[in-house]
């Protein structure tokens, strides 16, 4: 985990439950004598996120409905910190502006970017309901509302088109693309998680997420390919284009597309516990 990430150490559940008393009913002591929660329980994770956002980032009344993706905040914060490292190399003067592709109902990247570094953020999403929920989460917090704008992407075939307006400039784009290539693939992945946890199918688990959050035709690799192709059209309006890459085996294809377009790119490795992922960042001269 990034050295600047305040979540790199274990959770202080005493402070977190004081911040959000509803979390206390989900906290227990594991066999090692450490306080924890059941991370497979979506309500427990939701209450943990509420506590983390309130205690560390002074964000109140954040919430998302059931079946929406409930993000792990430490990992999302890591992406923001590594982005800051990337931008620090650019010697940027003045305020920093970024665009989040697929902001979701949780709007977690803009929220963290605003609270950690005071960046100005634009969040976009193809789901109108997600946009409304994200907007509600932001409007209840004046400290972040001044920094964040949410736009609905009405054209499902476009990523940047229609979202980046004439005359606008963003120092970076950020994206956590849909992971799976189909609903069937997403269902199989969920079944494997049930099996690994030794739970019956149908249990309440934190494997939520709307279809557009979990999968798209072609999965992560094709989505990033589309993003790379469209990014050329906005090379003068975005400094660094970036995306999370969860599947390492997708990197060779991504590199091929970037080389074809003569992009300058780099891969930033990230790790949270046993989970390994990376950011692909590219720009055009």
UniProtKB/Swiss-Prot annotation:
Q: Which InterPro entries match?
A: METTL16/RlmF, rRNA_lsu_MeTfrase_F, SAM-dependent_MTases_sf
Q: List the disulfide bonds.
A: none
Main subcellular location of this protein, as a coarse class: cytoplasm
Q: Does the keyword Aminoacyl-tRNA synthetase apply?
A: no
- This entry's Enzyme Commission designation comes to 2.1.1.181
Q: Per UniProt, what is one Pfam family of this protein?
A: Methyltransf_10
Give the location in the cell.
Cytoplasm
Does the entry feature the keyword tRNA processing, yes or no?
A: no
Q: Which GO terms describe its cellular component?
A: cytoplasm
**What is a biological process (GO) this protein takes part in?**
rRNA base methylation
Q: Which reaction(s) does its UniProt entry say it catalyses? A: adenosine(1618) in 23S rRNA + S-adenosyl-L-methionine = N(6)-methyladenosine(1618) in 23S rRNA + S-adenosyl-L-homocysteine + H(+)
Q: Which CDD domains match?
A: AdoMet_MTases
Keywords, in A-Z order: Cytoplasm, Methyltransferase, rRNA processing, S-adenosyl-L-methionine, Transferase
Name the Gene Ontology molecular function terms of this record.
23S rRNA (adenine(1618)-N(6))-methyltransferase activity
Free-text function comment from the UniProt entry = Specifically methylates the adenine in position 1618 of 23S rRNA.
Kindly give the NCBIfam families that the UniProt entry links to this protein.
PRK11727.1
Could you say which protein family the record assigns here?
Answer: Belongs to the methyltransferase superfamily. METTL16/RlmF family.
Protein name, please?
A: Ribosomal RNA large subunit methyltransferase F
Record organism? Christiangramia forsetii (strain DSM 17595 / CGMCC 1.15422 / KT0803)
Gene field: rlmF
């Amino acid at each position: 985990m990034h050295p600047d990430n305040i979540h790199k150490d274990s959770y202080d559940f005493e402070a977190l439950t004081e911040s959000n008393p509803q979390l206390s009913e989900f906290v227990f002591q594991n066999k090692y004598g450490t306080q924890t929660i059941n991370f497979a329980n979506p309500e427990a994770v939701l209450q943990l996120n509420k506590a983390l956002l309130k205690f560390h980032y002074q964000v109140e009344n954040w919430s998302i409905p059931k079946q929406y993706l409930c993000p792990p905040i430490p990992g999302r914060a890591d992406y923001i910190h590594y982005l800051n490292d990337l931008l620090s190399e650019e010697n940027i003067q003045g305020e920093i502006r970024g665009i989040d592709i697929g902001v979701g109902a949780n709007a977690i990247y803009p929220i963290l970017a605003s609270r950690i570094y005071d960046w100005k953020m634009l969040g976009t999403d193809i789901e109108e309901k997600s946009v409304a929920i994200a907007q509600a989460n932001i409007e209840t917090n004046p400290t972040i509302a001044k920094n964040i704008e949410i736009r609905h992407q009405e054209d499902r075939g476009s990523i940047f088109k229609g979202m980046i307006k004439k005359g606008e400039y963003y120092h970076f784009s950020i994206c956590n693309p849909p992971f799976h290539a189909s609903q069937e693939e997403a269902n199989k992945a969920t079944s494997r998680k049930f099996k690994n946890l030794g739970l019956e199918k149908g249990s309440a688990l934190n494997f939520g997420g709307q279809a557009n959050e979990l999968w798209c035709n072609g999965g992560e690799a094709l989505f990033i390919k589309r993003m790379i192709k469209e990014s050329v059209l906005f090379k003068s309006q975005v400094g660094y284009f970036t995306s999370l890459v969860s599947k390492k085996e997708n990197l060779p294809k991504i590199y091929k597309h970037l080389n074809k377009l003569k992009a300058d790119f780099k891969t930033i490795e990230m790790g949270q516990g046993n989970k390994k992922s990376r950011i692909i960042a590219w720009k055009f001269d």
